[in-house]
């Protein structure tokens, strides 16, 4: 209907001054053009402004998150003695720590009290929990490692020494690469076999470990970070603050130290 009404209106105004008509049309065109520019120009400006605002907000949120993470990290240094990193990429010579005896196992004297309390707490969960191993000298680790290699070759004569070593390294470290030589690591379990403790019991002990400054050193799913498969018996002392932070954020010692080093830059 709207489309058909225009011809009738023009016919009714045949006597109109064409100069006035043309002038009116030009004026209307100018007004429409100005209006369109105003609408779309403002729209583009709003979009650009909003885009800048979103980008700025996103950056601020990222910065805030990074700041929050940095602030959340304990006030410790990656060079602190309790955070000493020993692994295949960070081998160490004999460290000769001052050791103390806890339930027949040697540990760094500085953590003896923590080990006693942690063991007692674990035994409240399951009385069969006991210490299996603590401090080992590099010389002893050499003997242990070589004995494992020989055992693997005896069990499977087709293995070369190199192949046997690779197999052993899934559960034992080469001399100089074992953190047992720090005196800060303990093997503690309800059994003496590998990964055969009750998973629910291990989970409970893992949960209370930070209270005494310990973390499960080689958790499940973190082999790419630690280079070692899951070990339900191997606990490492890192200090209470660090242990709580690492456990809360599911961090290995390698990942935690990387954050601390980034923070200190």
Regions found by a protein language model. Give the residues of each.
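Extracytoplasmic cell-surface/polysaccharide-interacting catalytic and binding patches
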Residues: 2-265
């Amino acid at each position: 209907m709207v489309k058909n009404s225009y011809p009738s209106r023009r016919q009714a105004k045949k006597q109109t001054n064409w100069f006035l008509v043309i002038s009116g049309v030009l004026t209307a065109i100018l007004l429409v053009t100005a209006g369109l520019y105003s609408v779309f120009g403002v729209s583009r400006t709003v979009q650009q402004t909003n885009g800048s605002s979103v980008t700025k907000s996103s950056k601020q949120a990222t910065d805030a998150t990074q700041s929050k993470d940095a602030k959340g990290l304990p006030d410790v240094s990656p060079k602190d003695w309790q955070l000493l990193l020993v692994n295949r990429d960070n081998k160490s010579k004999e460290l000769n720590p001052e050791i103390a005896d806890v339930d027949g196992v040697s540990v760094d004297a500085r953590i003896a009290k923590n080990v006693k309390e942690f063991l007692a707490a674990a035994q409240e969960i399951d009385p069969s929990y006991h210490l299996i191993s603590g401090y080992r000298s590099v010389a002893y680790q050499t003997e242990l490692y070589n004995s494992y290699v020989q055992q693997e070759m005896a069990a499977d004569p087709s293995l070369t020494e190199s192949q046997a070593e690779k197999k052993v390294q899934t559960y034992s470290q080469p001399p100089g690469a074992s953190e047992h030589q720090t005196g800060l690591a303990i093997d503690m379990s309800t059994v003496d076999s590998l990964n055969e403790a009750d998973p629910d019991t291990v989970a409970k002990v893992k949960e209370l470990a930070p209270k005494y400054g310990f973390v499960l050193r080689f958790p499940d799913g973190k082999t790419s970070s630690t280079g070692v498969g899951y070990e339900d018996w191997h606990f490492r002392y890192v200090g209470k603050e660090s242990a709580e932070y690492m456990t809360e954020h599911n961090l290995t010692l390698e990942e935690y130290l990387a954050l601390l080093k980034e923070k200190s830059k």
